[in-house]
């Protein structure tokens, strides 16, 4: 993106402030400033912004089988995240591949691999902020079409598909930001809900992803004030979806707490909005941390570590025992050239989850080697699995009766 284009973007934003609401003014200025500072990084992605994406309309008028969230979650086995893909934060359709080590566009052949590998849940993280095109928070139609196309890949495979808002830097749970955030949450989710209101119960909406005080000292621990504000955000999400018509009145929705944290104080602060029996708790838990997520941590799994059993005991105490289902929306262990230890950890994790009928969704970011967060399972280019032993473990637990889990 050249300097003239950057200048034009900022000038257009300033001129548009004349007719914007105060909340919209703040959001657009923040977005334009962020976009300008990352213009060089995003220039390649910008080139494809106006491409037309063909969209199947085969699921726009499905018959909804009305079921409780508890019964729906009981039908789930294991899940897989299409990570670092639609959640990347560049602009245009090219954003889909901007974070990937190999620029492989998502295709149906990838999603076709999931059922045979023991997965019947597909989570599609999507970032919407850089695809908003005006002061009314309108989402780029081409981006929405592409999201729908990928959703259809999952639905066509009989998968349960989780669709969310992901790396949204515009929500910040502070009193000064709350009203503007709620305005945008309602606007974004009204559009998503309208586009997908004809889909059946296999499509699940997840309102927020790891909402937190970004860049602040309490970013990952939270504050009581921020936790309360996030409850208000979730309430706005639920009310917006329920008011959108179609099948959305009976759709199961996922609710999270501060940062989607597995810390007890953050989980216990979750207040479910008034609704029917169609709400699911979402939590992220890469455990044990030093083994699973810390790039400088150990490559040895300690089966005596209590982090995994304590997580599920807490989830049972706070939610499962009260009839509220839970999905671990993100988990996994980084590749440290330690497949045997990773298999042992995965076995213990899935066994602990199965006791409480909690499906777990692996974070696959298509990264396998190097010093970063390497959670990749699927070789998207060659349509193979990098770690067959891990996949065999998923397949085993997909067939396991939760009541028999040890």
From Swiss-Prot:
Similarity remark: Belongs to the glycosyl hydrolase 5 (cellulase A) family.
Signal peptide: 1-43
Biological processes annotated in GO: cellulose catabolic process
Gene (UniProt): Eg I
Protein name in UniProt: Endoglucanase 1
Xref: InterPro entries: Glyco_hydro_5, Glyco_hydro_5_CS, Glycoside_hydrolase_SF, Glycosyl_hydrolase_5
Residue segments, region Disordered: 30-62
GO cellular component, one term: extracellular region
Recorded catalytic activity of this chain's protein: Endohydrolysis of (1->4)-beta-D-glucosidic linkages in cellulose, lichenin and cereal beta-D-glucans
EC number, UniProt record: 3.2.1.4
Record key words, sorted: Carbohydrate metabolism, Cellulose degradation, Glycosidase, Hydrolase, Polysaccharide degradation, Signal
Segments traversing the membrane: none
EC class: hydrolase
Residue stretches of biased makeup (Polar residues): 30-41, 51-62
A GO molecular-function annotation: beta-glucosidase activity
Family annotation (Gene3D superfamilies): Glycosidases
Cysteines joined through disulfide linkages: none
Active site positions: 210 (proton donor), 330 (nucleophile)
Keyword Membrane found: no
Species per Swiss-Prot/TrEMBL record: Ruminococcus albus
Pfam families, sorted: Cellulase (PF00150)
